[in-house]
């Protein structure tokens, strides 16, 4: 075990000093599911979706709205908005190459925002946003997630995190896994689920199972 760990440390050191420099890497992903039929039991459907999301959350915020009187013919779609647009704070963030955009959904039946900080000691954090948009023929489930990975460089903590990632990958692989759990939850209450659109980064593939590929089908 000692020899293997030493070899890993040497491998990390020889891979390139640039990869071990202190840095912060942010990557976003999304998937949009279409769920039919519209006659699904609404409460069972929303509960199943919520249960699937909160299993991997450290912190959770849920908003449920009153169903609309008249359903639209086509569902809406999440949008990314800059909360600091046209402000001094926005200009300051832009000058520091920090682009902060948050997902929002209009006329959503339910919105869920979560944070997963269980791997914060290794410089990793995940934010997860989900909204359920009803329409005439069913529902859309829009999911947007952001993964932040901070590299502490050649510090004991940074080296430890790098060794762990080289063995089992980082916690970004739980994002497509949660997306798949949401899909399975919708199917468990009788929903027929299809993917409308998605973007799953290659880096989000699991160490043992390609969760990214299954989330985008």
Residue locations for each model-derived region?
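Surface-exposed short loop/turn segments
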Residues: 83-147
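Mature extracytoplasmic or otherwise solvent-exposed domains
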Residues: 21, 32-33, 46, 51, ...
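Bacterial N-terminal signal peptides that target proteins for export
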Residues: 1-6
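Polybasic, proline/glycine-rich intrinsically disordered low-complexity segments
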Residues: 104, 114, 118, 143, ...
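Terminal, regulation- and interaction-focused segments at domain boundaries
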Residues: 18-72
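C-terminal motif of bacterial Sec signal peptides marking the signal peptidase cleavage site
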Residues: 13-16
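Short beta-edge strand/loop motif at the mouth of beta-sheet-based domains
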Residues: 58-98
